[in-house]
Amino acid sequence: MASQNKINLIKIKNHLQNKNFKIGGFLNFKSDASEKIFKLCKTANQSLLVLSFLNKPSDYKKYIKATDILISQNVNTPKIIDQSNLYKFVIMDYFPIANASKYFQKPQIKKILPLAVRALTNLQKPKKKFSGVQVKSQNNLLKDALNGIETFIDHYDHKIQIGFYLNKLVKVSLIKSTEKYRKFKPTLTHGDFFLDNLIYYNQKVYVIDHQDTHYNHPLLDISSLIFDARRSYSTNVEDKLLKLYARRMKLNLKELRSDIH
């Protein structure tokens, strides 16, 4: 992991005091996000989370824009209370709880997953196209995948005598799958939509770590949620979530099942 820069807490405290936030000191806040710096601070009647983008300033505006998009789409996310363009940090709501992965295989997961699907369908029903949001290129995705396959085959060619034919076979299969992929219109996508990037608090699901929101394959996020490589759900749970997603997105369930696998 790359070394992190130290944020200037005195400047942050002065900024907050100039905005009439009367705070004491700062507490460390553990997070899995390696490039972000979090600090917890308290006023007389509320707790606030300071999120610094000092280590990756380019994410600062992306995070603010993505937050505005989520809120406009009726997707719950921690509210930005204040921000500093100069020091590249935001002050946001703090929820005194870990991410939703702590509820995996616990009773609460039965409420969390349907709420997550509802949040996702809200995200994917944009009232307008948002300018300045990246659209993933389908051609580039295919090109990268093919290059990766060629590199793999070339590396093991001396061991795999049928390397040439294997390469051709995989290419044909990938191209056929990509032709199926091309029929989809890119939609707003979180990119890492699974329990680790959700917070369950006061019976609501909040989406976090959303600065990379972009336009991509419409089934990417629902696939990430239901078929998470780090945890698996029963066939019954998967089926219920797919039915809910299909109903809210007005999709044919049979076609959805075929496309998502």
How would you describe each model-predicted region?
Residues 8, 12-17, 128-135, 145-188, ...:
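An alpha-helical support segment within catalytic cores of ATP-dependent transferases
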Residues 16-24, 73-75, 181:
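Short secondary-structure junctions
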Residues 21-39:
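ATP-binding glycine-rich phosphate-binding loop
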Residues 30, 39-143, 154, 182-183:
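ATP-binding pocket architecture of kinase catalytic cores
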Residues 36-42, 123, 175-220, 232-236:
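Active-site acidic catalytic loop and adjacent metal/ATP-binding pocket
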Residues 85, 96, 195, 212-214, ...:
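Short, glycine/acidic-enriched loop or turn micro-motifs at the edges of active sites
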Residues 150-157, 219-252:
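Active-site activation/catalytic loop segments of kinase-like enzymes and analogous catalytic loops
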Residues 252-261:
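Short, intrinsically disordered, charge-balanced linker/junction segments flanking boundaries
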